[in-house]
A protein has these predicted regions:
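An alpha-helical support segment within catalytic cores of ATP-dependent transferases
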Residues: 29-40, 159-160, 173-215, 225
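ATP-binding pocket architecture of kinase catalytic cores
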Residues: 65-158
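Active-site acidic catalytic loop and adjacent metal/ATP-binding pocket
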Residues: 56-64, 71-72, 103-104, 198-245, ...
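A cross-family kinase active-site recognition segment
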Residues: 134-187, 208-210
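Active-site activation/catalytic loop segments of kinase-like enzymes and analogous catalytic loops
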Residues: 244-278, 294-310
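ATP/Mg2+ or Mg2+-diphosphate-binding catalytic cores
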Residues: 177, 298-362
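Conserved NTP-binding catalytic cores of kinases and kinase-like/nucleotidyltransferase enzymes
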Residues: 2-7, 11-107, 225-228, 346-362
């Protein structure tokens, strides 16, 4: 996360804005606003507050008081009901000792405030560092796979439903909206996306294990201290969905480096995952198509954010949709990029691992 704006609580500098054209602060907070929020959540005496560049959807601030550091989020998209569902899920996960953010209560016992018609929450700051994808080693990836499987297992005990805002039908609807307004120079991209939707409509398997998924396991949503995973953040996209889709999204986000899928990274992530939850044969069979749908989902939603978001240009934070469009081309075998080894691992994954478990030890 990158510093955007800062204000000191004790006679320091006034609020300033740095390169706001690229920063995701949709709801600006003054020192007075922050002071009221700190008071309402009983966080202690304000020392400093910093607007954070993190994600493209919501507004975030890091607050420092004499009691420690806290993370403030203003939900710019979700309804109050949807925001409450996210809070409820986080509370459930914390009870199961899952390393996610901890929502805090206000003085009146609520876990959120209404701020200008939007849901505002405060969580404890998770210590550690967000590592760029090229700094993640096999130990990090193994830990991430293990944590994702743990989330999927813990999610079995969470019986409340959370609608999937990024399921296939929803992405189709978003694409139809976007497609009508795309500039003509993207016609080749439109052709590929049209074809991909036609393919996935026929070949996506909906009869796969489902449960609570994170939906957005990117490097900037995870913190480490050394090789130890300290926390998983940003449950904005969490919902009930296919578990293999969640793992496929993690592969797309974590195992793609220098324009190629890396089999060593893939094996480290999958190995960590399967120590807790071995994949079924149908999941292995569906893995390539779930990778394709994940790449398609992020291509479409990033195009939408870029071309259709109704916000002043100075408030936008741009994420290049072509990053995932390029992955999609590789997954479609229209471009080279390391998929041969990964596809082979998927094709033999179930039988190979079954053999390894049954093989007598020497």
């Amino acid at each position: 996360m990158t510093e955007l704006a800062a204000g000191r609580g004790q006679g320091g500098m006034a609020e300033t804005w740095k390169d706001s054209r690229q920063m995701a602060i949709y709801t600006a907070l003054s020192k007075k606003d922050i002071g009221k929020i700190v008071e309402e959540f009983a966080l202690g005496d304000l020392v400093n507050f910093t607007g954070m560049r993190t994600g493209s959807v919501n507004t975030h601030y890091l607050i420092e008081t004499k009691r420690g550091k806290f993370f403030l989020k203003i939900d710019e998209v979700k309804s109050e009901v949807e925001a409450k569902q996210e809070i409820d899920l986080l509370l459930h996960l914390r009870k199961q000792n899952f390393p996610c953010v901890q929502p805090l209560k206000t003085k009146s016992g609520r876990f959120h405030l209404d701020f200008q018609g939007k849901c505002l929450t405060v969580t404890r700051h998770i210590e550690g560092a967000e590592l760029p994808v090229d700094s993640l080693n096999s130990t990090h990836l193994n830990a991430l796979g293990h944590a994702l499987a743990n989330l999927h297992l813990i999610g079995r005990s969470y019986k409340k439903g959370i609608d999937n805002r990024f399921g296939y039908n929803r992405i189709v609807a978003i694409y139809r909206e976007v497609r009508r307004q795309l500039p003509s120079h993207l016609k080749n991209i439109v052709r590929v996306l049209d074809d991909e939707f036609s393919y996935l409509e026929s070949y996506l398997d909906n009869n796969l294990p489902k449960g609570i998924i994170h939906g957005d396991l990117f490097p900037d949503n995870v913190k480490f201290k050394g090789n130890r995973l300290t926390g998983i953040m940003d449950f904005e996209a969490a919902c009930r969905g296919k578990l293999i889709y969640d793992l496929a999204t993690a592969v797309n986000a974590l195992c793609f480096l220098e324009d190629r899928y890396r089999i060593d990274r893939f094996e480290a992530l999958i190995s960590g995952y399967e120590t807790l939850r071995p994949l079924s044969l149908p999941e292995w069979d569906s893995f390539p198509n779930e990778l394709r749908f994940s790449a398609l989902r992020f291509t479409v939603t990033r195009i939408k954010d870029f071309y259709l978001r109704q916000a002043d240009d100075s408030q936008r934070i741009y994420k290049d949709f072509k990053e995932f469009y390029d992955r999609l081309l590789i997954l479609r075998r229209e471009k080279s990029g390391g998929m041969e080894d990964v596809l082979l691992a998927m094709a033999t994954g179930y039988d190979y691992r079954k053999y390894q478990k049954s093989k007598p030890s020497k």
